[in-house]
Structures are given as C-alpha cells and as structure tokens.
Amino acid sequence: MSPPAGGAAVAADPASPVVLLAVHAAVRPLGAGQDAEAQPRKLQLIADPERPGRFRLGLLGTEPGAVSLEWPLEAICYTVRGPNQHELQPPPGGPGTFSVHFLDPEEAQQWAALVRDATAEGQNGSGSPAPAPAPAMCPISPPCSSMAQIPKATQPEVDLPQSSGNFKKEELATRLSQAIAGGDEKAAAQVAAVLAQHHVALNVQLMEAWFPPGPIRLQVTVEDATSVLSSSSSAHVSLKIHPHCSIAALQDQVFSEFGFPPAVQRWVIGRCLCMPERSLASYGVSQDGDPAFLYLLSAPREVSGQSLQNSKMDRKLGLFPQSLGLPHDLQPSSSSLPSPSQPGWSCPSCTFINASNRPGCEMCSTQRPCAWDPLAAAST
C-alpha cells in the first residue's frame, strides 16, 4: 500500500533519527465521518537528520500492515481542541485532517508544548514570522504555505525546546547511555551531536557492575610530607572502600574518619599521583591488601591571630616530628624519632621527601629538580 500524497512512508530502520518525544493516541480521519473507528497510533517528534535545526512529525501505525507517515513539522497545522483532543492537518494533497485523542491529559499537554516550541524554533531558524492564530482555533503550527524555505547551509543547529527543560536533556542522556551499551554507534553519534550542540555538561562514568566487587581493605601508609624522615615517621591504617569510588570520595572518607581535609591530602597509588576525579580501580586497586600512600601537607595559616580551632588543626596536621597529636588510629609506627642526619629533596609532583642521593622520586619516579643542591641543603 503506497502512502497518501503529502507524506513519506517511514521505513523500519533500527538506526532511526533522534526521537525527542513519542506518545500514543487514538487517531481518526475527520473526513471518514463520525462512525469511523479511531485507530491506535504513535506520534513522535524527531530531529531531522538531513536538515539541522528542523524537526519532523511522524504518525506511526501500531498494528501489522498499518501505514506510517511522516511530515516536516513546518508543513503541518496542529490545533489543540481540548485537554485530550487535538487535530493534525497534513500539507495539501495529504490524507486530510486527523482527530487525535489522548487518554492522559498531562501527556497531551506535554506533547502540545513540545510541538509548539519546536515549531517556534523552526520559525526562528527560517526568519519568517509566525502568522497570527485564527480566532476560532489555537494553532500550534502555522499553515504550510506561510513557511519560507531556506537553503540547508544557512539553517541553524538543532535546538531543544525550552519548555521541555532538563527533562528532555536527561532523556537524551539516557538514550545516549542505552545506545552505547547496545553498541549502536549511529544512534549514539546522533544523540551526542544534539547534546554537544547545546553544550550540555555530562558526567560520564562506568556503572558499578563494571568494577571489581567490594568492599575491600585498602592498606594505607600515611606520611608527613613536611618531614625529611619519611621512612621513620609513618603510620599505617586500613580503610574499607569500594574500587569504584573516586579519589575525591576517598579524601572525604579520610576527612570524615580522621579529620584531615582533602586540601592537605596527596594520594600515591602504583607510583602515580592520584587525580580526584579518577576511580581507585583505575589505579589498579581491586582486592584486599592493595597498598596506597597518603602524604599530608601542612595547612597554611590564614592570619597570625587564628582561632583556637585552627590551631588545634595545625597541631593535628603537623604530624611528624613536631607533635604526635594524631587520632588514635593514626599513631606513628615509631614513638621515638631520631634526629635528621641530612635533609632530602621534595618531589615537585607528589611532595614526597626523598633521600638526598636519589636521582628520582621513590614514589612517582619524577626526576629530581636540577636546581636542588644537596650541599646547600645540608648546610641549612
């Protein structure tokens, strides 16, 4: 069965364009008379892949053998007759006006708002003002004859209707996730293109199921980065963590359990200085007993007359050898600290204090600064 004039038949293509919204309704041709039975149809609004900045409205059959039609949005007239009742008029030469009945008034309102805003976006892109609505109707879309066609090269990018708000952005983000998980490269590229056109900020993360199971025990060696006696001024703790947790979450956990702010924490795992946004698993943490190193920096004093609370925090942060005012779980492994024989050099990357004769950092392998003079450091 060939489609009626004015509408293009829709092929069952699994890599279909981006669908902004799809709703179900009972559709009946008005020219068929009152006795004609309404048929279940699916209406969908999609971004036109061949004309950036434009949309298409599809009327899809839900039963075997039903003809599915699709028109450019600017070529149709869409009228709201009531909370549940709408009318769809295709361009001249088409199948005639359809009566569209929604079961859910909220769904009908959401659909009408999306069509209205998408139509407005198309008008802004074409540069043609929208004609005034007829007194007896509430047209959402202007008559097709009033729409001026413009060259494809001057058409704007696809724009998301404003009234749909974050709901549509979240729906597109969900579609992107589903397309990637299903291996649908074309659909993922289309959705990603729409999101990129609107500079939508996304937080792309792996699901927890892709990480090693947890919780596990992370063996942490705590060092005072301000002390030259790193080998003698260490403490050891065991933290219960999940491999999917980020370094930032680990810093917050240490702050919650021991009182050390994230700003003074430097984590080194697998000879790498850890970045807050990366996961523990990305540094190879996957099982009980995996090692990690935590270096604590001295917090700078804001003013000379700081509060008593800040003074207490300074004493807690000045771990070794200035004071031993540590939480009970972070007591140094050696209670008597020997006097320093000579100062070492501080790694510019992870702040680890290395022995003066080491050419590179013991923790992260960063090369020793060329300007560091062991003789001058020893004299001070």
Curated annotation (Swiss-Prot):
Tissue expression per record: Highly expressed in thymus and spleen. Present at high level in splenic B- and T-cells (at protein level).
Region (Interaction with SHANK1): 172-305
RanBP2-type zinc-finger residues: 342-371
Sites bearing Phosphoserine, chain numbering: 163, 307
Residue ranges constituting the Ubiquitin-like domain according to the UniProt record: 216-285
Main localization of the protein described in the UniProt heading: cytoplasm
This protein's GO CC annotations: cytosol; LUBAC complex; synapse
Pathway linked to the protein: Protein modification; protein ubiquitination
GO terms, molecular function: polyubiquitin modification-dependent protein binding; protein-macromolecule adaptor activity; zinc ion binding
Organism superkingdom: Eukaryota
GO biological process, one term: tumor necrosis factor-mediated signaling pathway
Keywords recorded for this protein, A-Z: Cytoplasm, Metal-binding, Phosphoprotein, Synapse, Ubl conjugation pathway, Zinc, Zinc-finger
Region (Self-association): 1-177
Keyword Signal belongs to the record: no
SMART domains: ZnF_RBZ (SM00547)
UniProt subcellular location: Cytoplasm, Cytosol; Synapse
CDD domains with a match to the protein in the record: Ubl_HOIL1 (cd01799)
Assembly and binders: Monomer and homodimer. Component of the LUBAC complex (linear ubiquitin chain assembly complex) which consists of SHARPIN, RBCK1 and RNF31. LUBAC has a MW of approximately 600 kDa suggesting a heteromultimeric assembly of its subunits. Associates with the TNF-R1 signaling complex (TNF-RSC) in a stimulation-dependent manner. Interacts with EYA1, EYA2, SHANK1 and SHANK3 (via ANK repeats).
Record text about domains: The Ubiquitin-like domain is required for the interaction with RNF31.
Disease note: Defects in Sharpin are the cause of chronic proliferative dermatitis (cpdm). Cpdm is a spontaneous mutation causing a chronic proliferative dermatitis phenotype, which is characterized histologically by severe inflammation, eosinophilic dermatitis and defects in secondary lymphoid organ development. Mice also display lower total and cortical bone mineral content and bone mineral density, trabecular and cortical bone volume, and trabecular number. TNF-alpha-induced NF-kappa-B activation is attenuated due to inability of the LUBAC complex to mediate linear ubiquitination.
Role: Component of the LUBAC complex which conjugates linear polyubiquitin chains in a head-to-tail manner to substrates and plays a key role in NF-kappa-B activation and regulation of inflammation. LUBAC conjugates linear polyubiquitin to IKBKG and RIPK1 and is involved in activation of the canonical NF-kappa-B and the JNK signaling pathways. Linear ubiquitination mediated by the LUBAC complex interferes with TNF-induced cell death and thereby prevents inflammation.
Protein name: Sharpin
Organism: Mus musculus
Gene that encodes the chain: Sharpin
